[in-house]
């Protein structure tokens, strides 16, 4: 497994701009051969906007089942976990409606 440690880039993630930058760093890892651990240990804040831009927009690159096979989460605090789940649910719903 490959680890992507979000705390390398900060502890508070609130902007779409940062979400896009980190998604661009994540995508080559996720497209690699090993499963990627998305490690949020030490991260205090993950906004809905950041979660959508960084995590949920990965659904534009691959189906949900493939994303689940290629990634796993670690160290999300309850509020950050909720932001990620809400972002994934909303993005999935939008993509499902478009198909």
Language model features: what each stretch is:
Residues 10-35, 40-89:
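Amphipathic alpha-helical interaction surfaces in cytosolic regulatory modules
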Residues 1-10:
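N-terminal presequence-like segments and adjacent domain-start helices
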Residues 96-99:
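Extended, charge-rich low-complexity interaction segments
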Residues 92-93:
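Helix-rich interaction surfaces within compact, conserved domain-sized segments
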């Amino acid at each position: 497994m490959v680890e992507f440690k979000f705390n390398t880039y900060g502890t508070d993630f609130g902007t779409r701009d940062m979400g896009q930058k980190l998604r661009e760093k994540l995508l080559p890892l996720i497209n690699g051969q090993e499963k990627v651990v998305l490690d949020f240990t030490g991260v205090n804040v993950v906004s809905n906007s950041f979660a959508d831009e960084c995590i949920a927009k990965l659904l534009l690159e691959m189906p949900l089942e493939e994303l689940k096979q290629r990634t796993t989460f670690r160290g999300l605090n309850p509020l950050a976990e909720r932001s990620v789940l809400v972002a994934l649910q909303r993005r999935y719903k939008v993509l499902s409606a478009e198909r």
